[in-house]
From Swiss-Prot:
PANTHER family: VALINE--TRNA LIGASE, CHLOROPLASTIC_MITOCHONDRIAL 2, VALYL-TRNA SYNTHETASES. It comes from Dechloromonas aromatica (strain RCB). It is found in: Cytoplasm. This is Valine--tRNA ligase. Monomer. The gene is valS. One of its GO terms (cellular component) is cytosol. A motif ('HIGH' region) lies at residues 45-55.
Amino acid sequence: MELAKAFEPADIERRWYPEWETQNYFAAGVDASKADNFCILLPPPNVTGTLHMGHGFNQTIMDALTRYYRMRGHNTLWQPGTDHAGIATQIVVERQLDAQGISRHDLGREKFLEKVWEWKEYSGNTITKQMRRMGTSPDWKRERFTMDAGLNKVVTETFVRLFNEGLIYRGKRLVNWDPKLNTAVSDLEVVQEEEDGFMWHIRYPLADGSDSLVVATTRPETMLGDTAVMVHPEDERYKHMIGQMVKLPLTDREIPIIADSYVDLEFGTGCVKVTPAHDFNDYAVGQRHGLPMISILTLDAKVNENAPEKYRGLDRFDARKAVVADLEALGILEKTDKHKLKVPRGDRTNVVIEPMLTDQWFVAMSKPGDDGKSITEKALDVVHSGEIKFYPENWVNTYNQWLNNIQDWCISRQLWWGHQIPAWYGDNGQIFVAHSEAEAKAEAAKQGYTGTLKRDEDVLDTWFSSALWPFSTLDWTGDEAIDAANPLLKQYLPSSVLVTGFDIIFFWVARMVMMTKQITGQIPFKHVYVHGLIRDGEGQKMSKSKGNVLDPIDLIDGIGLEALIEKRTTGLMNPKQAESIAKKTKKEFPEGIASFGTDALRFTFASLASPGRDIKFDLNRCDGYRNFCNKLWNATRFVLMNVEGHDLALEHQQNGPACGGSAPLEFSFADRWIVSQLQRVEQEVEQHFTDYRFDLIAQAIYKFIWDEFCDWYLEIAKVEIQTGNDAQQRGARRTLVRTLEAVLRLAHPLIPFITEELWQTVAPIAGRKTHDSIMLAAYPRAEEYKIDAASEAKVERLKALAYACRNLRGEMNVSPALRMPLLVAGGGAEISEFAAILQALGKLSEVQIVDDMPADAMAPVAVVGETRLMLKVEIDVAAERIRLAKEIEKLEKQISIAQGKLANEGFVARAPAAVIDQEKQRVADFTATLEQLKPQLAKLGQA
């Protein structure tokens, strides 16, 4: 099969992915005779979402690992699936209904859920189709959805077990409340951004009228729910007031002055109002001091009946204005300062989140279970003991810090879309938790209740079902006999590694550890590879409002400027941003975005996967790695042109005479060198896979293919094929095709499409077409006996000579098209061996080996070890003298300018460190060049 002249990724991707999927190459291995199993879980993306750069990055890493271990011969399962994404999905469907003038309450729960399922079926495949475009290889036949019937059963079973063990309870606690959605939300769904606000200073008079205190607050409306004022116990200003009562302004209540070390002595007046029902820190203070909890807001953030009558029914922000006006009228508003503060907003609604005291369901994090240990304790133990390892290890500190400061987990949400809580209520408020209504009725009857039961309308936090992902996706039932016979559970729990961003270590990683350990007794995974988050080129978070979002599919296929602008400006929360986003996009991508293909994008993602919190995405890298793919394609065409139809003596293994009539074969030092280098890169890549250093894998593969194989070995092999005898030509040809075939397998986990396409042609010629697809072929592993230090040293000397030759041409400004002789003195027999190769690499007419350089030669001489080299060229001494003098004058001027900048105190004080370092480097570089040119001018003598 002849390769196309140019690498066209779109055509290759269209052909190969359906073939891989149709042939069932991604299927989970269940061969019990294999000792090794590899399993990885896809963090389930939102079912109605679309692929973003974070997904593309994360999935590239997971796919590279999966393909690597599949090629290593492991039973392999990459478990895919999607998340029902309670709030996100419900909001989308509610917006669709709003556009028709209908609310979910108009429809009722059952009809509304039908609409959500319709939307899920309509848009639920978008993200998995996009994943396929990324070349991912999960077992699609095992795809799961968190609302599947099987997973729903696992959720119910887990809830019932934890409730029966006393580890799930219902209680009144402070939670993040979204007044627009009318539901509790998780910390991850709250965005804290700095905004301009005010600090109001209010005077609270002592009840006996003898004195007063001034408290400062950013939320004066909540003072209507104050239940104390606190001061630091060591604050001499207020020690005498501790235990006294103050009159709460605008109300008829008196509240105590309490002492608590939470107060910052240095901040404000040192007096802090305490509103336990509307502030998380105050709630903790209230718990410590047994303060009453007075909630003054309704669930839609209007003032309720617990506040004075004049404020009731006001929106919280209108109430703020009214309270401030009344305080001013009373003359007790001491002052108002402008103040920057962090305002918590819902990430989906942008409304200010309200700490709200509501009845919710919680998982007890610190309460001992039946085995005497809390859920949190067990989760800490398995990391402390090394059962679960983090890569990089420093993320253990984050994990421990969160778990050591953990609060009980609020798992209920006031939504309709999600896993409905399996709890039923009797008329008298009794709670019956069961697997079904029938079971709940039976349990109620046991307890003597025979009245009607009403099911809890709330659903579970999406993270609850996600926390069960490691075992719910493997068909766990909770029945010991059934689960013991399940080969998937036996082979793939715990899974091998979890690949995740650091932002969900607590929300997802820790909770999977807790729940899997608590319910199954096993850890969910052995390793956690934590990566940074993809940012734009300037390190900014990618977001719709910033107008810097990139779609991975657009990088694969390309997108025109107008289409890109439309994409970035459609659906903005603030339409006024559209103009500035369009302007920025035109500046950044004046011609739109070129198509790079999947392989180039994947290689870019891998190369960026270095340890750290932030990963700056650089589009130029995509361009560079598209060129890398082109280089590999063209190198393969060169190899095929030189080996197809030729005898490669594939049956023959050693240098020397023929065996059994096969043709003789001879490997040169260069052949042995590239094979030796191949072993080293194979060793390197294997170690980097073990360490999860995908950036170093990409770097090692790139360096070997571009530098060693293409830039050096192909050029040397050309010479060997042109000038060698039959045995040497066979050695070079066989080394070419065998090395290329191994390299394609080596690079396959990162760039699957191009390697599959090329391997299909290369492997049969190399005698290594062992499988129908490269993804099933064995991953190359180093054979140490093939490492040849002597050949490596020899090629390093050859490289040094070639570099010296190129430098001589550069120094003398010789045209690349001009071929001339090279004089070489010293170096012994090795120079004769190198001569033909050096002639080709140096673009020389010949290599002349001489005893010494001509005494009257005016051309510069390069020295490499004991070898001296000089281009044999007639030079116009006068013209060369003028050229060198001008070059020296120019360099001296540039050195003077740079040194002048560095001597300027103002410049040094203002300039960034990087700019100063750049100037210093310029001086060093100019000086080094100057030191080379001055001796050359001196050698030419005076005019």
